């Protein structure tokens, strides 16, 4: 007799913080799924989990509602505060998260402020030995740019900008992770408050240009009023009253440029860019007063996407590097490690006279001298569609530093191909299946700043946090990772050893940064990379005999690790003949606790079963597994609509499986370990269509009792 399924319907609140990795495993394995192809998949997966099924949107003001609800719980149940629950941070201490924002105090280079796109604003006053998060827990967690007012007497004033709208950790490149405007610190970075004129109050719905930020900078020359510039979605803005009000000096509110950038010279001259695709106001611009801008766009460049600016420290000269749409745009072709083409451009502009147009400015296209034709595809310049871009000119040497996935330095400003050296990112000569990272550095460059007192010294920020060098120069640049304690990692999953109570080992699936393992409860214990990619669901076998480790889109391995967490061997075990598009972006898996020898995994709308995982040889074979997988005969049909399996749970003693879908429904499979697996639907008619089943927990003593968690907002 079918019994009514008892439900616990809850709201899952997902907090995001970015992360990556030190290269300390004996070998690294690159997950060869195409990064650009996966962006839409990640976006759809995140949206499915959170949207209100009734409206198809994430509700306005939902973060403030969450905090208010939490305060109500604490008020109504004082035991939540008094019962003595103690939470211990487990890190990762040694893994810095994705960082776009970096600023160095002009008075003290040991005072550094930096920001993660979803990790908040952090500060160090001892050069990176210790870090402290200075943004409030209930403040918007995103930070894409930080600037200090450089004028004497005003240097305790700092500004930050939120809102990454390309390549976000929450939803994939090209998707909005909306900000909520700019923030101000009046106490030298110790505390931050929103700038009201830029705050929309609705960071989950796009209502203002200020929600998509690219850069905020302060002019060093205005003696009377603070002069700020912001590059946002669609516009360049200027404020002369510490951000109380803003004037749009470039751009518009319709047919807007998606990408923009702004930079200010020491004499107050302003350079700006607005991307060209579908934009009515677009181009490269220069302004002597920050109000009146002249279009100086070079005639040889026909179209462009994101373009970032690097100014010469003493001359009125600017470099621009960025992504262009095609081979006819004016740039050059390059390829990523999979051979996928993209097009990039590197331009130099020298101001001569007048308003900078015509003979008043000289343009050079130096794109052909970028390192786009190296023998190893990992060594080539790759901006990943404009996700990682930076260019800087080193004071005193005129060396030009550019960044994509890797970091490069050219001693002749890229006037030739002959004088360029890779000084960061991936290890030189990396290939698919055998790759590493440049010693103490990290791929995916977002910015680099030079020391004002010693231009050979520099700080670099990337998807792996913050690095410092005392000698930025061609050749073997020595980097120091100063991200220790800069805890900004984002986890998709955490796996414990369920067969050994209180075991300290944790295996985590990290956003964009693979699967890390740690062996100690100590906060400062080092986490080690196992398999790279977007870390997903994992499993630890009894006595840690083997591990099941997965990355995005169902890419699954069986691995053997030593007692230090190093990967000794591995093999791929996801089924052959299944296209990656069928999987959830972060695809669940479960091992039957009855014998620990059967792996279950959703394959889109079907459930797969792999028997005999204990005896499956770990032989280094990285081809998908043939023949051994079995699947449910019937496709899951939920509420008369084809649905995907989003989660599953296996009972502790009866081989019973429950699966949930992205369209509210839950199914039960009896005796799933043998014969055909038949799904029996359980009643969920009281729930709205579209509810995302995030997790299921089975009562260990009675498999007729389960808890089901829906992660969507407003499902109750």
What are these regions (language model features)?
Residues 1-10:
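N-terminal Sec-pathway targeting helices
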Residues 9-20:
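Hydrophobic membrane-insertion alpha-helices, especially the h-region
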Residues 23-716:
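Beta-propeller blade termini and top-face loops
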